[in-house]
């Protein structure tokens, strides 16, 4: 089961899901990451709950 959290290391709009995914995995030890529009485009990281 994965839990979503806004990235703590991403700044600005998220326009590249691949980069968001790499940054979440490499910098925040997440399982993966993706860009989602929540007001504006943000990078969200996904972790084991």
From Swiss-Prot:
It comes from Clitoria ternatea (Butterfly pea). GO terms for biological process: defense response to fungus; killing of cells of another organism. Belongs to the DEFL family. Keywords: Antimicrobial, Disulfide bond, Fungicide, Plant defense, Secreted. GO terms for cellular component: extracellular region. SUPFAM superfamilies: Scorpion toxin-like. Disulfide bonds join 3-49, 14-35, 20-43, 24-45. This is Defensin-like protein 1. Gene3D superfamilies: Knottin, scorpion toxin-like. The keyword Cytoplasm does not apply. It is found in: Secreted. It comes from the Eukaryota. Possesses antimicrobial activity sensitive to inorganic cations. Binds specifically to the fungal plasma membrane. Has no inhibitory effect on insect gut alpha-amylase.
